[in-house]
Amino acid sequence: MITTDLFTRGWIFIRGVPAMKFLPPEGPPEIAFAGRSNVGKSSLINALVNQKGLARTSNTPGRTQELNYFVPDGFSGEGADLPPMALVDMPGYGYATAPKEKVDEWTKLVFDYLKGRVTLKRVYVLIDARHGIKAKDDEVLSLLDKAAVSYQIVLTKTDKIKVAGVPRLIEETLQKIKKRPAAFPFVLATSSEKGEGLEELQAAIVLAANGG
């Protein structure tokens, strides 16, 4: 049984996956993070495990170009000594100035992963609280619905908007996703900078990884 204590361990980067053939063998449950470029995926992963330098953060949109795998330290990965869970930082989408060929490569990798990974238990789709769900986000949500991959919306950077605006934004977001078949009907609000909402997200991840 996976518990939130897992987030207090040291975590390590184990591999970057530029193409499907480089994926690790299917084993422990995987929890993936998707979102627009610079939505704060890497910062949120670092905050979740309280390790500032684990996932590389960058002011340059499109920095994450691979599926980056992170697991708790202390497991050999051999035989039965597998980590109980893996976190996967996915390439950001919606970065318009990247070369089209590169964007197409990222897109194919992400879509193939979402459709074909049996051990993927949930995707957390990160939405910048300042902007809400945009057209490109809707495209990704539609893909997840079509692939029947369970996903949950996580609002990021809530410290950048007025406190009173957060409940309203949560309700607006719920209304936008209520008819989507694969959407988990609960929206989480987080701030990596302030440490807000992290315990709730950790609990949600554990529940999803345990099959809930």
Curated annotation (Swiss-Prot):
**What GO cellular-component annotations does this UniProt entry give?**
cytosol
Q: Which PROSITE patterns does this entry report, sorted A to Z? A: G_ENGB
Cofactor names from the entry are:
Mg(2+)
Residues engaged in binding Mg(2+): 42, 64
Give every EngB-type G domain span: 27-211
SUPFAM superfamilies attached here?
Answer: P-loop containing nucleoside triphosphate hydrolases
- What InterPro entries does the database record attribute to this sequence? G_ENGB_dom, GTP-bd, GTP-bd_ribosome_bio_YsxC, P-loop_NTPase
> Which keywords has UniProt assigned to this entry?
Cell cycle, Cell division, GTP-binding, Magnesium, Metal-binding, Nucleotide-binding, Septation
> Where do the annotations place GTP binding?
35-42, 62-66, 89-92, 156-159, 190-192
Known role: Necessary for normal cell division and for the maintenance of normal septation.
Per the similarity annotation, which family is this? Belongs to the TRAFAC class TrmE-Era-EngA-EngB-Septin-like GTPase superfamily. EngB GTPase family.
Name this protein carries in UniProt: Probable GTP-binding protein EngB
